[in-house]
């Protein structure tokens, strides 16, 4: 369920995926921390199937194997049902580059090329946020730290300041939709809660 798409300077397609809501696993409710919202790179290598909807990415679960691990969605009909082993085989499923927190609902992605912000050529994601967790999360614009093509971690640039992007007392009154870079390296993001466009600046 890829939503935000971006073609980089090497003509490779990056995407951010919105995972499903109300997720259970063999009857156990795991929706608060799962599925992780995926960052995918379509570069012509490996499997052409990226897992949705037969498989999902772990973000945080009891007895889990780590963020980004693929699991089979046990709620599917028997004809569509896969196994965990099948989902983890890269010959079947192209693994994600990174798994962001569940229910962030990322909608926009861009690779920063400018110099106005001290973020190198990292990826920047605009996330709309979601209702489907006990503590609503994800109204953020986040930086995805990279090492080559690998994403190693995320950092909230603007929005809810909790490490999980959770809404806090006096919650931020915006819901990011997309993020774009202007020719001069300025970064802007749109907000459909207030019908606004914000400019991101760096204060030293």
Locate the predicted segments by residue.
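Beta-propeller domain segments
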Residues: 1-170, 174, 203
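Conserved interaction-surface patches within small, structured recognition/assembly domains
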Residues: 176-178
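Blade-level signature of beta-propeller repeat domains, shared across WD40, Kelch, NHL, RCC1
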Residues: 180-204
């Amino acid at each position: 369920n890829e939503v935000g798409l971006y073609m980089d300077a090497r003509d490779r397609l990056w995407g951010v995926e919105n995972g499903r809501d109300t997720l259970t696993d063999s009857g156990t409710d795991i929706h608060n921390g799962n599925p992780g919202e995926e960052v995918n790179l379509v570069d012509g290598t490996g499997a052409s199937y990226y897992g949705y909807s037969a498989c999902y990415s772990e973000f945080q679960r009891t007895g889990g194997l780590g963020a980004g691990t693929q699991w089979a969605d046990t709620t599917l009909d028997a004809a569509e049902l896969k196994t965990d082993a099948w989902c983890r085989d890269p010959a079947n499923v192209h693994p994600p580059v990174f798994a962001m927190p569940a229910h962030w609902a990322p909608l926009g992605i861009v690779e920063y090329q400018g110099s106005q912000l001290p973020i190198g050529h990292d990826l920047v994601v605009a996330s709309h946020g979601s209702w489907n967790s006990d503590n609503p999360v994800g109204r953020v614009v986040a930086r995805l730290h990279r090492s080559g093509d690998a994403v190693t971690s995320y950092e909230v640039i603007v929005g809810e300041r909790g490490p999980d992007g959770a809404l806090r007392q006096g919650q931020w009154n915006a819901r990011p939709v997309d993020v774009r870079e202007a020719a001069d390296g300025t970064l802007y993001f749109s907000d459909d809660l207030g019908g606004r466009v914000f400019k991101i600046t760096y204060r030293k």
